[in-house]
């Protein structure tokens, strides 16, 4: 059974050492702040999406359906969607990297427990 590293090189379970777990912990602690910042930015830009849509809706004329369509196709809303999408991509990238490191730690904990119990 192999664990796939994010960079594409395989890692055998026997190679999962305390050093690798330490690397995972360092990676997690070094990305705490940026992870939180990107999560906050995504939330902030979600509000920006609502504001851009509402602003464009209020400026549009026509029926409610027409105003809704104009708001969703406005430049202001498109810019807000682009900003939100870029922030979400950055957040997901760091979130996925952190989840990978957490899986490494979880697997190591399981293997260590199994070794202590003599199951491996």
Positions of PLM-derived features:
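Long amphipathic alpha-helical coiled-coil segments
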Residues: 39-42, 47, 82-116
């Amino acid at each position: 059974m192999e664990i796939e590293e994010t960079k594409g090189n395989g890692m055998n379970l026997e190679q999962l050492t305390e050093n690798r777990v330490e690397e995972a912990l360092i990676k997690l602690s070094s990305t705490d702040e940026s992870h939180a910042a990107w999560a906050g930015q995504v939330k902030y830009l979600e509000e920006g999406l609502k504001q851009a849509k509402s602003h464009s809706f209020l400026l549009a004329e026509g029926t409610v359906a027409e105003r809704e369509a104009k708001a969703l196709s406005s430049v202001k809303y498109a810019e807000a969607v682009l900003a939100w999408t870029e922030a979400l991509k950055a957040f997901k990238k760091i979130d996925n990297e952190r989840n990978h490191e957490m899986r490494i730690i979880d697997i190591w904990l399981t293997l260590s427990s199994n070794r202590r119990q003599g199951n491996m």
